[in-house]
Amino acid sequence: MNCLLPTLAATLLSVFLAPVAAAADFGAPMPDGEAVDIAAAASGATARTGEPALYRGRITEVCRKQGCWVVLESDGHSARVMAKDHGFSVPEDASGEAIAYGALEVEPVSPEHARHLVEDDGASAPAAQELRIVATSIRIL
């Protein structure tokens, strides 16, 4: 019993003092502010078009070729986050919640671009029109 107590105490202490995974930033410095949920952005997309803002969602897809885009999803709505001018990339195994900073656009998806996304990047077949965020930075939480 005397040996068990120190072992138990050490185990509990290591669990509580284990480092918490820090957020990872990619691209330009992330500005401070409140992020708009992707579902909320989708419902008012035309009102938000063109103005840089923070957008939040869960990563559901990542470009498998270069990590140059991710898809963020929230409550059944999604937006493809594209790295502006290919200015940054994210790890191909990125997952979890993320915040992107960039300009929201509602963009038609050409057949050529759809083919590129599916064949080269491993994406799901996109709709004829998609919500897109041209981002200067992304933070994976």
What is the role of each PLM region?
Residues M1-P6:
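Positively charged n-region of N-terminal signal peptides that target proteins for export
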Residues T7-P19:
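Bacterial N-terminal signal peptides
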Residues A21-L141:
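OB-fold and OB-like single-stranded nucleic-acid-recognition modules
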